[in-house]
Amino acid sequence: MAEQESLEFGKADFVLMDTVSMPEFMANLRLRFEKGRIYTFIGEVVVSVNPYKVLNIYGRDTIEQYKGRELYERPPHLFAIADAAYKAMKRRSKDTCIMISGESGAGKTEASKYIMQYIAAITNPSQRAEIERVKNMLLKSNCVLEAFGNAKTNRNDNSSRFGKYMDINFDFKGDPIGGHINNYLLEKSRVIVQQPGERSFHSFYQLLQGGSEQMLHSLHLQKSLSSYNYIRVGAQLKSSINDAAEFKVVADAMKVIGFKPEEIQTVYKILAAILHLGNLKFIVDGDTPLIENGKVVSVIAELLSTKADMVEKALLYRTVATGRDIIDKQHTEQEASYGRDAFAKAIYERLFCWIVTRINDIIEVKNYDTTVHGKNTVIGVLDIYGFEIFDNNSFEQFCINYCNEKLQQLFIQLVLKQEQEEYQREGIPWKHIDYFNNQIIVDLVEQQHKGIIAILDDACMNVGKVTDGMFLEALNSKLGKHGHFSSRKTCASDKILEFDRDFRIRHYAGDVVYSVIGFIDKNKDTLFQDFKRLMYNSSNPVLKNMWPEGKLSITEVTKRPLTAATLFKNSMIALVDNLASKEPYYVRCIKPNDKKSPQIFDDERCRHQVEYLGLLENVRVRRAGFAFRQTYEKFLHRYKMISEFTWPNHDLPSDKEAVKKLIERCGFQDDVAYGKTKIFIRTPRTLFTLEELRAQMLVRVVLFLQKVWRGTLARMRYKRTKAALTIIRYYRRYKVKSYIHEVARRFHGVKNMRDYGKHVKWPTPPKVLRRFEEALQSIFNRWRASQLIKTIPASDLPQVRAKVAAMEMLKGQRADLGLQRAWEGNYLASKPDTPQTSGTFVPVANELKRKDKYMNVLFSCHVRKVNRFSKVEDRAIFVTDRHLYKMDPTKQYKVMKTIPLYNLTGLSVSNGKDQLVVFHTKDNKDLIVCLFSKQPTHESRIGELVGVLVNHFKSEKRHLQVNVTNPVQCSLHGKKCTVSVETRLNQPQPDFTKNRSGFILSVPGN
């Protein structure tokens, strides 16, 4: 929901003023400043007044209020313009730039930092580590560049003494992926001299105030600022910047960015070397130049990783090549001092440029492929020195003010001139608004052959000794009649200007008097080749790489380098061309007073800035103009989905007609104008409503696309799955066939083998056939068994079946099953086993057959049995297919007990070689016996007994439980007891004895 400020704070947008006049503009600006509202809109331009105090309007909560909101929805703020530039870049894939302008001390540097902070905060919602790393480095680069490129001036405690333009690269999702920094015209003369009330660059003070005692000792420094000539002027000045704290912040930032420890140490050594250079004093002994404090030379040589004698020679002599001859020309005291200062300035400039290059190497976009990652878009942020008028204005102020003229010209071209020309070109009704075009001042400075820079270059190239006065004379002769140039010679009555020293330029921001003293020297930017060779020969690789031209031979003839002014002019032209290629957003900074006071609003001072920034003309153009314009084709491409007449494609005669239909459908026809090739929208609210409608339709479009795409994916997945299943099915069929064929091949002819294929190894089956293999092996084993059984006589088959049953039940659990001998079964009828009583047993057996009608005798044998009264007796058991009989052989095999087989629930035997067996019955009257044979003795018959009984029960489809355990559990008339087996050496025959838990069967040992 849109939030508007109360009228007590004035008009939030100058476009909403009742009348467009300077008094009303200034009254609104003053009211908002006094109410703590430092930002005001002019349409899509933000006017910012430096509050000279800390305001709590840049926190995370404020960022969230502006994130993704339109300009008119929230009160004026830097975040609003930053978000507008970001949205334009992301929505339309168009490069944008934010140009921050205003004079020195108006708050440009702080504004750029807040804009960077906002962009960093609203990007990378998914918290990708690489994006966070890039954002962190982009933010940290600010404080590093401020330390080495900013200084305290009379107008600003943190004045940028260089120009900075940063491109931030974004991927297709709108997340920062890298950047690039361009720097312009570092004010290196500040290294050696400062005006009263000013300081050198922050880096020197931070090192001395924040460096540890150990570090300063290693650099041969002391904390006293007044000990060093180059910074003595500002040593006692108070600054709002805490140098000691900032030193740690900058050091940490350099580590975060990626500077190596040895690189950071080299930076400190260079700063220390410059401070020591400033303390060098030269004297002349006759014709020989000398250094008064020679120990300092050794310190400088140590810091620069070179030799002291080489440093001394470079400071006192100049090597000159004349043809093939090379001579060392002695310096005068003045020339030596000049060379020392030029060397100090050059070292610092190279250091600063190296820092910028090093940051660029680290933050540049790497491995970005537009075909894979989408278009790489850019937001540029320009923070460059503001317009300056000092008591003494020299070459640096001339370049700085020329830069501001170029930027003002760009503003005029884009906002005032081109916009009005576009309305006329497109046939939009328009009343021309007058404005001051400063192109005449730009031409005065940069015009080929006729401009001040061209005249300065000509003077520098003249043979012989050329003075600054000669340069001024050339200006007078060539520009004397120019309306924006004057000097004492062209305007003799103007006593402000001194003869042979001053000239005045009528800039768009006001008149500035420049002193020509130093123009020639600063433009030539002379540094003797000896110093370049000295630094190139340093053993420190970082220093060596800063001076690549030092490798040139002394006799090598080089092309005359471009002058400082021409280099700066070329860089400004390139900068303006770069900015002109992007969609611009403006922050116009105003300085409320020269006393840095948060309470004072200097009307005259502010009025002057409003006038030269062209803000009133900007208001007039904005009130009469349109907030947005776009070609019909692009407009239709973005918004066609919000009307059924244009979605998905229109059938109207032209895109213009289609756009008209779309606008009428939405009811915005009163807020637009139709040009020849573009549509013009007057208010941002209409554009915002179009965006809302588009966003609503995009949901439906996305759902439709998702439905179609998901359907396509599902069909593709189904086809792939079906194809995969077909492949799997055929592959499995192939594997099955291969397996079957291999089995058939291996087992071919096994019927004719002696072992019927027992030795044949089965092939490894596929997983799907493992159960089939088990079944197949079972079938094969059954077949093989049937083949083996065919060789057995029919009379032996019952015995074989019984042995198989015994094996199934007892194999692996008992040592001897008696499988190797023939099983007779009815041992009581066998004469070898019972020679005296066999004749008596047979009639008894026949009588029982007649009586009980049994069909087969399963087993009979002599046993020793124990009863519940612990009485041990010799008995015999006779097992038929119907009953189990317990007999007394001493009484002619009288039947002592008959147990029907259906009453038998199981057998229990031990796991040893003994013949213990317990017959379990349903009535819990178990029969405990130990089998024994008389001929041969100790013959094992347990396996035979178990086998015939289990086989018989199986034939009747009943199950007989067989337990193999020691001790054996049993029940005598319902009483639980155990029978354990012990082996005794002197035991003649098996015998039972009583113990606490039941019985012990003692069997003879070996």
Swiss-Prot record:
Q: Where does the Myosin motor domain start and stop, copy by copy?
A: 9-695
Give UniProt keywords alphabetically: Acetylation, Actin-binding, ATP-binding, Calmodulin-binding, Cell projection, Cytoplasm, Endosome, Motor protein, Myosin, Nucleotide-binding, Phosphoprotein, Protein transport, Repeat, Transport
**UniProt entry tagged with the keyword Flavoprotein:** no
What region holds the IQ domain? Answer: 699-719, 721-741
Give its localization. Cytoplasm; Perikaryon; Cell projection, Dendrite; Early endosome
**Where is the stretch described as Actin-binding?**
572-594
Q: Name one GO molecular function term.
A: ATP binding
Q: Residues in domain TH1? A: 812-1005
Does the keyword field hold Phosphoprotein? yes
Phosphotyrosine occurs at Y536
Identify the Pfam families for this entry: IQ, Myosin_head, Myosin_TH1
Q: Which residues carry this modification: Phosphoserine?
A: S200
The protein's matches in InterPro entries, at most eight in alphabetical order, are given as: IQ_motif_EF-hand-BS, Kinesin_motor_dom_sf, Myosin_head_motor_dom-like, Myosin_TH1, MYSc_Myo1, P-loop_NTPase
Traits of the deletion mutant = Mutants display no defects in body left-right asymmetry, no obvious motor defects, and normal kidney and liver morphology. Tracheal epithelial cells display aberrant ciliary bending angles and disordered ciliary bending patterns. Likewise, planar cell polarity is disrupted in ependymal epithelial cells.
Query: Quick one: which residues bind ATP?
Result: G102, E103, S104, G105, A106, G107, K108, T109
* Residue positions, PTM N-acetylalanine: A2
This molecule's function is given as: Unconventional myosin that functions as actin-based motor protein with ATPase activity. Plays a role in endosomal protein trafficking, and especially in the transfer of cargo proteins from early to recycling endosomes. Required for normal planar cell polarity in ciliated tracheal cells, for normal rotational polarity of cilia, and for coordinated, unidirectional ciliary movement in the trachea. Required for normal, polarized cilia organization in brain ependymal epithelial cells.
> What is its quaternary makeup?
Interacts (via the two IQ motifs) with calmodulin. Binds an additional calmodulin chain via a third, C-terminal region. Interacts with F-actin.
* Record remark on domains: Binds a calmodulin chain via each of the two IQ domains. IQ domain 1 mediates interaction with calmodulin both in the presence and in the absence of Ca(2+). IQ domain 2 mediates interaction with calmodulin in the presence of Ca(2+).
What name has this protein been given in UniProt? Unconventional myosin-Id
- Organism, as annotated: Rattus norvegicus
Q: What gene is it encoded by?
A: Myo1d
